[in-house]
Amino acid sequence: NILQKLFVALLSLCDFAFLSFFVPLFLGVLKGSFIFMADLMRASQLMCDVEFIAVSSYQNGTVSSGRVQITHDLQQDITGRDIVVIEDILDSGNTLYFLKNYFMTKGAASVTVVTLLDKPSRRTKPIVADLAGFEVPDEFVVGYGLDYAQKYRNMPYIGVLKPEVYSK
């Protein structure tokens, strides 16, 4: 299974990077990252804390509005914490650029970005993932947590959504 191989690679990098010097805060960006984050955490050997944040920039479309809104904020203080942001896809970079700055202003000691999918061709903000699973082309992908209008998240694989589905 290609995802299992990805987990092994990401976890070995993560586990090596963080070793056992501290307990990082794994911070999932809802809703898209929840499946990836759960699988990553189940396979990890790291002792870590868990937190979630929900943001919105897509509403029901396929193109980011460019305006990031926090819809569910952090429930704990992150001052001095090493944050590992777990994201489903790094696309335009608007969301992760916003979040990385937001966490630093909240007092995070460091922010590391781990993403399942990376779409560098769409980047509009100067942000790069510290760890990325797969680079994907400029197509709208769904499944394994990724959605279109809140649909397709539960697919056990990642697929390209046909344009006729979202062009209506």
Question: Which role does the model predict for each range below?
Answer:
Residues N1-K168:
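PRPP-associated nucleotide enzymes
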